[in-house]
Structure formats: structure tokens, C-alpha cells
């Protein structure tokens, strides 16, 4: 979590950590989902969701296909997930989405403004980044760059 005088704190976590009380966030933190197609139980865990900041559908589909192919080749679930990211150039494509998609840019600017005004935010997705790569880490880096 980063702290700047007069500015909100920024964190990221995954939904299961919130559901099982595995993460320590200040009580005033707004839980912002960044999931393209959230489940009802995801909605029940977060305060809001910004689907525009989730990876675009075509990127999710190509990553899932690569992941399944890698599992067939014998990689474990986590290994296949992480290798699929490299295979489809996930990071580069997601960063491009944040730059070129009007809804994503608007949502990103809104989060940056909220942080500047003092609101503390935690970006929430499904992946435990101790074992799997997740777009929310890229999103957090982007927000931190805008704050610098």
C-alpha cells in the first residue's frame, strides 16, 4: 500500500482474500472490482465494479485458450496460466487496452481523481498474485505512475 500526504492509499487484493479475511485494509477503503464479467458473489464482496478496467473479452478468450492448450501439454493450472500470459503477450495487450479504450481511460482517470482527493482504494479481481499473474497489478502500476 502506498501513502502520500493528502492522497488516498492504493492497494490491490483478490476476492477470496476478502471473503476469508486474509487481507488487512483500512476500514474506509473502497473495494473496487476490476472484472469484465463478475459473478453475483463477486458483486456481494466489492463496493463497486468497473468492467471497463477488466481485460477485453478477446484477450481473455485468447489467454484461456492458450492456458487450456498448455494444460493439455502437462503444465499445472498456475504454470499454464502464467505461461499463457507470455504466449498471448497479455501485459502489452492489456496496457494497450488501457491506453486506447475510451471507457477504460475514463475509468482510470476517475480512479486517479478519487485517489488524489483522498479516497483509499483497493483494486479487486479473482487471482491470487502469489501464484498467478493478474491484470490488476498492471492497473495498480499504471495508477501509481499517474500519482508520481
Predicted regions and their residues:
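Residues lining hydrophobic/aromatic ligand-binding pockets adjacent to catalytic sites
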Residues: 2-148
Amino acid at each position: 500500500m502506498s501513502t502520500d500526504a493528502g492522497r488516498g492509499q492504493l492497494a490491490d487484493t483478490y476476492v477470496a482474500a476478502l471473503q476469508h479475511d486474509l487481507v488487512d485494509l483500512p476500514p474506509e477503503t473502497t473495494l473496487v472490482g476490476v472484472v469484465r464479467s463478475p459473478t453475483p458473489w463477486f458483486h456481494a464482496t466489492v463496493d463497486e465494479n468497473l468492467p471497463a478496467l477488466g481485460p477485453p473479452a478477446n484477450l481473455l478468450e485468447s489467454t484461456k485458450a492458450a492456458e487450456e492448450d498448455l494444460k493439455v501439454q502437462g503444465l499445472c493450472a498456475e504454470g499454464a496460466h502464467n505461461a499463457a500470459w507470455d504466449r498471448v503477450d497479455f501485459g502489452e495487450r492489456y496496457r494497450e487496452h488501457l491506453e486506447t479504450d475510451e471507457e477504460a481511460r475514463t475509468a482510470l482517470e476517475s480512479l486517479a481523481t478519487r485517489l488524489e482527493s483522498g479516497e483509499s482504494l483497493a483494486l479487486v479481481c479473482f487471482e491470487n498474485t502469489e501464484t498467478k499473474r493478474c491484470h490488476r497489478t498492471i492497473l495498480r502500476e499504471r495508477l501509481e505512475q499517474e500519482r508520481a
